[in-house]
């Protein structure tokens, strides 16, 4: 099930506070532990699609009342925006709360469709699609984004590409963990890392922060 020991221990400690020794647990106690472990180790984010239909708001409120992570989504609007952006009709970056029309020579039906999408986006602060991905990565899975670079001054790789890669790692990951994700040999011959912003030298056990830009220095 890919559940780490620290997670199991943490859930055990939380559940067992008022239950005494594990050997004395009954079936109800075991079920409560199993449920808590599942919720902690396999979090669920609900992308509540079709949030624009009339019954959606009440359904979303009802699910949110259970404490679950629920993101209202309008996937059809996201698809329309991406297609329009690909054709140069609008400027839109996934996750933005609105968009800008570039081509004003649109048919009336196209204008109405875009205006309808704009109104929905104002209500939900976007289409909810990118927000669902963000909530899954950063809230449910507690991931961080780290940028490895070869040139700490130019923030680039050896070919001059600025911030060429982005790695999503678990919170608590170290500089050496990043090296392993880039290449196993970097981790094997790891010497130290450099924070590209502060130019500070970092050890193997340095705990990475979200949006760190890191250069790995190895013996090879």
Regions found by a protein language model. Name each.
Residues 1-220:
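C-terminal-of-GTPase-core extension/linker across diverse P-loop GTPases
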């Amino acid at each position: 099930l890919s559940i780490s020991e620290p997670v199991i221990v943490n859930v055990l400690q939380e559940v067992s506070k008022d239950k005494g020794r594990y050997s004395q647990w009954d079936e109800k106690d075991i079920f409560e532990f199993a449920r808590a472990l599942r919720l902690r180790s396999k979090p669920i984010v609900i992308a509540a699609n079709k949030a624009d239909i009339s019954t959606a708001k009440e359904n979303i409120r009802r699910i949110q009342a259970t404490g679950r992570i629920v993101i209202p989504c309008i996937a059809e609007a996201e698809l329309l925006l991406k297609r329009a952006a690909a054709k140069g009709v609008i400027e839109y970056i996934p996750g933005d709360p609105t968009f800008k029309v570039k081509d004003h020579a649109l048919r009336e039906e196209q204008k109405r469709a875009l205006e309808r999408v704009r109104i929905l986006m104002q209500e939900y602060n976007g289409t909810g699609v990118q927000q669902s991905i963000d909530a899954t990565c950063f809230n449910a899975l507690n991931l961080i984004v780290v940028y490895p670079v070869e040139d700490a001054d130019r923030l680039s790789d050896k070919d001059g590409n600025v911030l060429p890669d982005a790695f999503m790692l678990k919170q608590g990951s170290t500089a050496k963990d990043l090296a392993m994700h880039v290449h196993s040999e970097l981790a094997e011959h790891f010497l130290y890392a450099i924070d590209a912003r502060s130019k500070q030298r970092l050890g193997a056990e340095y705990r990475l922060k979200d949006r760190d830009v890191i250069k790995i220095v190895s013996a090879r």
